[in-house]
C-alpha cells in the first residue's frame, strides 16, 4: 500500500485540464456541494496531508482513494495562491446551495419593487463574497476598494432591475418581466467583478514562464482573466434564469398549479438547484483556470513589461506566459 501511495503526485491534476471535458470533470469533482458540510478540522487535516505529500513524506500510508479525497477537500476549500482556508460562503462548492436559494428567491419574488431591491441586495452581497474569495490573491485589495466595488455593483444591479421592471411593466408582456432578475445579474457582473478585482487591473497580476517562475506583473493578463470570469459567471446563471421563467409561465396557467401557489418559491428553488448542479462545473470549465497569454500581444500593449522580460530571459522570451485567472 505504501508503494502505491508514494506514486501519487498531489499537485498533478486527476483530469486533463487542457480539454473542456477534463475541466468539467475536475470542477464537478472540486465543487461537490457535499464538501460544504465538512468541518474545518477535517479540512485542515486534508491540507496537512497534502503538504506532507508535497515534501515527500507520505506516511502514514493511505489508499489512493483516501489521498484523492483529501486532495478534493484541499482544492475545494483552500485558495490556490495563498493556501489559506477560504470563506465558507465564498467557496465554489457553495455555489449550488447558496445560488439556488438566492436565484430561486429572485425568480419567485420579482413582481414588486421592494422584493426586487431586497433580493438584488442579498445577491450582490453574496457575489461580493464569492468574487473576493476567488480573486487572484497575489494582488491585494484595500478595504476602501472592496467597499466601492460592493456599493457600485449593488447600485448597478438595482438600477438595472428597477429600470427594466419599470420599462417592461408598461411595454412588455408578463413573460418578459420575468427576465428582470437576469438582466440585473448580468449588469451587476460587469461591474462587480472588475471593481472587486480592480487592483489586479491597476497593478497587474503575476505571470509565470513554463517552469513556474514569476517573470513580471501584467495588466493585460488581469483584464483577460477578469473578462473570462465575467463571461463564466453570466453563463453559470443564464440557463436557470432564462429557461425557468418559460417553464413557470406555462405552469402558472394550469388550474392544478394555481391551487397550490405556496409551492411556487420552493419549486423554483429546487429547479434552479438542478440547473446549477450542471452549470457550476460547466461555467468554471469554459476557460482554463491557469490561463495563458501570448507574449507577442504583450509586446504590442505592454512594451515596458516585454522589455523587462527580454532582460530577465536574456532575449529568450517565452512564447506564452501563465497566470491564475481566478474563478
Swiss-Prot record:
Q: Which GO terms describe its biological process?
A: mitochondrial transmembrane transport; one-carbon metabolic process; serine import into mitochondrion
What reaction does this catalyse?
Answer: L-serine(in) = L-serine(out)
Residue runs in coiled coils: none
Which UniProt keywords are listed? Amino-acid transport, Membrane, Mitochondrion, Transmembrane, Transmembrane helix, Transport
Q: Cross-referenced InterPro entries, in alphabetical order?
A: Mtc (IPR004686)
Q: Which residues cross the membrane?
A: 99-119, 143-163, 175-195, 228-248, 267-287
Q: Which taxonomic lineage is given here?
A: Eukaryota, Metazoa, Ecdysozoa, Arthropoda, Hexapoda
Where does the signal sequence lie?
none
Please name one Pfam family that this protein belongs to: SFXNs
Q: How does it sit in the membrane?
A: Multi-pass membrane protein
Family per record: Belongs to the sideroflexin family.
Protein localization? Mitochondrion membrane
What PANTHER family does the annotation carry? SIDEROFLEXIN, SIDEROFLEXIN-2
Protein name in UniProt:
Sideroflexin-2
UniProt keyword Thylakoid, yes or no: no
Q: What species does this protein belong to? A: Drosophila melanogaster
